[in-house]
């Protein structure tokens, strides 16, 4: 399947209705790396009823116990760090679940949701995220339908994304993505999509944290003209004011990205898909294969 075809699957992924059965728990721990791990990052920002802790390493926190819902996410099912963390969680009697397309993780005896194979992990964000949303948030049918509609529209018209990609390419810019709650993880997702799809370095941060660090170099950093600032528009007046003032006092020009949708679910997936198409178009302009992750695979083999 070509990457352009993978993009077209996201709208159907938001209708993936699988969920886990959970018992009494007082915390959630989600383990995942790379394209699989981003689902946990996004979920942790939109769910606040119980503490959510993310694991992107071999080891798990000491507080994991029998009141922990532990979700291991690995698209391939063979991610070394995630398998190690899952084994540790099981030893500590956590309620371990898994989201995977197969591999070793699917054979470990955990409560497992099997998702379709044949995609890049980062192109499976709906399959990886929706089981978490369905289990712990339980979205309204109308919210899912709205997300489906917006994604369908983006599939048909992504000229804005193509235009931004052209500006970045023609100026040989380094993308800098700024978000704010509840889209901080989406800003990071864009950063990683620039990395993997377009094969360019990128940087992400979020308001208002960046006003306590990034603000200083924004005005006078060297090679300032090489950066291209992409900022998610916020309907929170506190963040909106910070964005406006930051742009003004640092003398930068922010390329504002509107967030379409009325429900949070629709907004999240709209921004995800916007970034997917933007980085896909940049990959095309650069003449690189957005599906190629050969260096990452080579690294895995070297350290195995």
Curated annotation (Swiss-Prot):
Transmembrane intervals: none
Domain SIS span(s) in chain numbering: 16-147
Residues annotated as catalytic: 196, 212, 300
Keyword field contains Isomerase: yes
Any GO MF annotation of the entry: glucose-6-phosphate isomerase activity
Binding site for D-fructose 6-phosphate: 35-36, 74, 76, 79, 122, 212, 300
InterPro entries noted in UniProt: Glu6P/Mann6P_isomerase_C, SIS_dom, SIS_dom_sf, SIS_PGI/PMI_1
Class of this enzyme: isomerase
BP GO terms, sorted: carbohydrate derivative metabolic process; carbohydrate metabolic process
Enzyme Commission (EC) number: 5.3.1.8, 5.3.1.9
Keyword terms, alphabetized: Carbohydrate metabolism, Isomerase
Pfam family, one: SIS
Domain of life: Archaea
PROSITE patterns, per the entry: SIS
Keyword Isomerase: yes
The reaction(s) this protein catalyses: alpha-D-glucose 6-phosphate = beta-D-fructose 6-phosphate; D-mannose 6-phosphate = D-fructose 6-phosphate
Assembly description: Homodimer.
Similarity comment: family membership: Belongs to the PGI/PMI family.
Function: Dual specificity isomerase that catalyzes the isomerization of both glucose-6-phosphate and mannose-6-phosphate to fructose-6-phosphate.
UniProt name for this protein: Bifunctional phosphoglucose/phosphomannose isomerase
Organism expressing this protein natively: Thermoplasma volcanium (strain ATCC 51530 / DSM 4299 / JCM 9571 / NBRC 15438 / GSS1)
Record lineage: Archaea, Methanobacteriati, Thermoplasmatota, Thermoplasmata, Thermoplasmatales
């Amino acid at each position: 399947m070509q990457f352009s075809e993978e993009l077209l699957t996201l709208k159907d992924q938001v209708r993936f209705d699988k969920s886990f059965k959970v018992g009494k728990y007082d915390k959630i721990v989600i383990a995942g790396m790379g394209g699989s791990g981003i689902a946990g990052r996004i979920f942790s920002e939109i769910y606040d009823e119980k503490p959510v802790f993310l694991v992107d390493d071999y080891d798990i926190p000491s507080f994991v116990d029998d009141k922990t819902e532990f979700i291991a996410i690995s698209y391939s099912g063979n991610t070394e760090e995630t398998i190690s963390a899952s084994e540790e969680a099981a030893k500590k009697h956590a309620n371990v679940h898994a989201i995977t397309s197969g591999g070793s993780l699917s054979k470990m005896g955990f409560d497992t949701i099997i998702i379709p194979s044949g995609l890049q992990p980062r192109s499976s964000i709906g399959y990886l995220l929706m089981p978490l949303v369905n289990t712990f948030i339980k979205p309204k049918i109308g919210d899912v339908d709205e997300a489906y509609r917006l994604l369908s529209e983006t599939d048909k018209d992504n000229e804005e994304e193509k235009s931004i990609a052209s500006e970045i390419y023609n100026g040989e810019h380094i993308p800098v993505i700024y978000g704010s709650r509840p889209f901080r993880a989406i800003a990071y997702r864009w950063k990683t999509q620039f990395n993997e799809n377009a094969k360019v370095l990128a940087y992400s941060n979020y308001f208002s944290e960046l006003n306590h660090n990034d603000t200083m170099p924004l005005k006078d950093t060297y090679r300032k003209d090489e950066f291209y600032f992409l900022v998610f528009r916020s309907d929170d007046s506190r963040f909106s004011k910070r964005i406006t003032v930051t742009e003004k006092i640092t003398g930068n020009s922010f390329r504002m990205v509107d967030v379409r949708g009325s429900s949070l679910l629709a907004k999240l997936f709209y921004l995800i898909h916007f970034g997917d198409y933007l980085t896909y178009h940049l990959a095309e302009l650069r003449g690189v294969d957005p599906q190629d992750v050969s260096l990452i695979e080579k690294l895995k083999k070297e350290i195995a």
